[in-house]
């Protein structure tokens, strides 16, 4: 017996504002039913010795510590800018 009906598929499609044909609804019903069946098979696994996890891989901070460093001299920065004035880089206006 199917756990997900064609009517369920049509209802969810309607909620998601998706227009699907009857043939598509039947196709999706079979696919979703197969997914639910597979998920139910996972419930049969013996996981008594498996520790609960929140991540598959161990989490570690890959970011470096935020340490201030001496920047480039203003002249060095401005020589790469297409336009500058009063030691500031000029850019085209973004807002009117």
UniProtKB/Swiss-Prot annotation:
It holds the Pfam family GatC. Keywords: ATP-binding, Ligase, Nucleotide-binding, Protein biosynthesis. Its EC number is 6.3.5.-. GO terms for biological process: glutaminyl-tRNAGln biosynthesis via transamidation; regulation of translational fidelity; translation. Disulfide bonds: none annotated. Gene3D superfamilies: Glu-tRNAGln amidotransferase C subunit, N-terminal domain (1.10.20.60). One of its GO terms (molecular function) is asparaginyl-tRNA synthase (glutamine-hydrolyzing) activity. The keyword ATP-binding applies. It catalyses: L-glutamyl-tRNA(Gln) + L-glutamine + ATP + H2O = L-glutaminyl-tRNA(Gln) + L-glutamate + ADP + phosphate + H(+); L-aspartyl-tRNA(Asn) + L-glutamine + ATP + H2O = L-asparaginyl-tRNA(Asn) + L-glutamate + ADP + phosphate + 2 H(+). InterPro entries: Asp/Glu-ADT_sf_sub_c, GatC. Allows the formation of correctly charged Asn-tRNA(Asn) or Gln-tRNA(Gln) through the transamidation of misacylated Asp-tRNA(Asn) or Glu-tRNA(Gln) in organisms which lack either or both of asparaginyl-tRNA or glutaminyl-tRNA synthetases. The reaction takes place in the presence of glutamine and ATP through an activated phospho-Asp-tRNA(Asn) or phospho-Glu-tRNA(Gln). Belongs to the GatC family. Heterotrimer of A, B and C subunits. This is Aspartyl/glutamyl-tRNA(Asn/Gln) amidotransferase subunit C. It comes from Bacillus cereus (strain ATCC 14579 / DSM 31 / CCUG 7414 / JCM 2152 / NBRC 15305 / NCIMB 9373 / NCTC 2599 / NRRL B-3711). The lineage of its organism: Bacteria, Bacillati, Bacillota, Bacilli, Bacillales. The gene is gatC.
């Amino acid at each position: 017996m199917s756990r997900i009906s064609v009517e369920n598929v049509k209802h969810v499609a309607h909620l998601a504002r998706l227009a699907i044909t009857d043939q598509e609804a039947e196709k999706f019903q079979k696919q979703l039913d197969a997914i639910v069946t597979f998920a139910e098979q996972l419930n049969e696994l013996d996981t008594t010795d498996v520790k609960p996890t929140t991540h598959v891989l161990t989490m570690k901070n890959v970011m470096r510590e935020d340490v201030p460093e001496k920047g480039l001299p203003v002249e060095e920065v401005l020589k790469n800018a297409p336009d500058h004035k009063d030691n500031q880089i000029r850019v085209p206006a973004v807002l009117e």
